[in-house]
Amino acid sequence: MKNLLKTALLLLVVLAMAVPASAAVDLSKIVVLGASVDSGFLDGCWVKHGQIDAWPAIFARQAGSDFQQPLLDEPGVGSSKGCMILKDLAPTFDYALSVPKPLNLTLARPYNNLAIPGYLAASATNCVTATAAPPCNNPLIDLVLRGSGATTLQQAASLKPTFVIIGVFGNEALGAATSGTVIDGVTLPPTAVYAASYKTIVDTMKAAQGGTGVGVVATIPDISTLAYFTAVSPIIGVNAGVPIYVLGSTGCASGVPVCSVPPGTLVPFPMATLMKTGYGIPCAVAPYPNCNKPLPDNGDAATGMPGLLYPSEVSLLKTRINDYNSQIQTLATADGYKVFDTSALIAGITSTGRDFGGMTITGKYLQGGFFSYDGVHPTQIGYAIVANDFINFVNANYGASVPQVDMSVYLFGGNSTGYPLGLPVNQGDVLNYGAAYWTPETLKTWPGLFGVDLRHLPLPEGVEEGPVVPERRGVEVQ
């Protein structure tokens, strides 16, 4: 009997060892390191209605984890101009004055979400307060670190997280791209420099977890897929079947101060304001006041206007991002972390989109629904899509059972336009919002798609004759 009992106990031990550790993943204490896209930044703004929709925050909410963030009340903290407000569909934007109003400043421990807009990998390893010099020349640092004397990396490690998320540390490339000034080794850090900081991050978090990394790291997307670089085409017309490109001043023949940019040049979205007055436009195409003047080649720090990205610069950026991603893959995997391919996710959105019962979310600027007004960061819908893909990834790789996000909450309003997050969506409201965009035939295909049954609800008045447009809450379009 004793031998039988010993055999049974041994068998239980063997079976327990045979069960993958991922099947017992603990999501009770999630900690995030990263930058703007991981912090819920959107519309050029860091503010509560974006922060509570940050994709890591959505994931933590779905996982039932206590997830504290450095929330900022309206109007939030924006880019140099402030938070973007759509004024008309030209598009024209107003900018709300940046006013930091912290809502969770007295939390007696570090935040779970330590992602800070504008952060570099080197910022996470070096910065304890805002300074005048890179990588710590960021006033948002003090809103998050609160004079603790510790870096975000040190704070994250001190929480002893059960699950680590290392988000998109891509400002090393994005900063150079959005400025339009890509100088290898100056505005674009060498791969070895990036890798050194990233290794410190993953090694430190692995040690904080007892020597085994449990969590996920994210790759950096291809900047050429962002709406910021695709909203404005370099082709402004066609003459006798030949494309007419915008005008620049690089690569022109000797003695020629302005010429058409080569194919493959990217025109950052803010340049649209210059083009409206004629910059970059041949006078033969449109005799605007500034026609025949080139668009700037490099960014202007004083005005915030970026510069054109020429094919050689785009190629260098893509190569460097691929090199960064290779280092992320190697370093994270060596420490036990899984690698979430953010780059493939964004590429899929921009190439084919994502379908939700007849509604396709794409990467098109303003029209697509994935990118916010700033053209770089997602909308609440976009963040929810990222969160759902991340949930699928964690469930598949760690044997978890985190429930999917109810996309209807985001597709028909989101938290900032009428629906309090975390509360059930009223099915009548869902149908009324759906009727604004789709026919009854499309609506009939919805039962079960979003986890709600709409078949028993009456169609809104007037929908039989086609879509009607209700008042859109939270967005004023003049």
What are the roles of these predicted feature ranges?
Residues 45-200, 410-477:
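Conserved SGNH/GDSL esterase-like catalytic core that processes O-acyl groups on lipids
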Residues 63-64, 159, 197-217, 320-341:
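A structural motif corresponding to the C-terminal end of an alpha-helix
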Residues 30-44:
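Catalytic nucleophile-elbow at a beta strand-turn-alpha helix junction centered on a G-D-S/GDSL motif
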Residues 30, 54-59, 363-415:
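Histidine-centered active-site loop/cap adjacent to the catalytic His
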Residues 8-18:
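Bacterial N-terminal signal peptides
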Residues 19-24:
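Sec/Tat signal peptide C-region and signal peptidase I cleavage site
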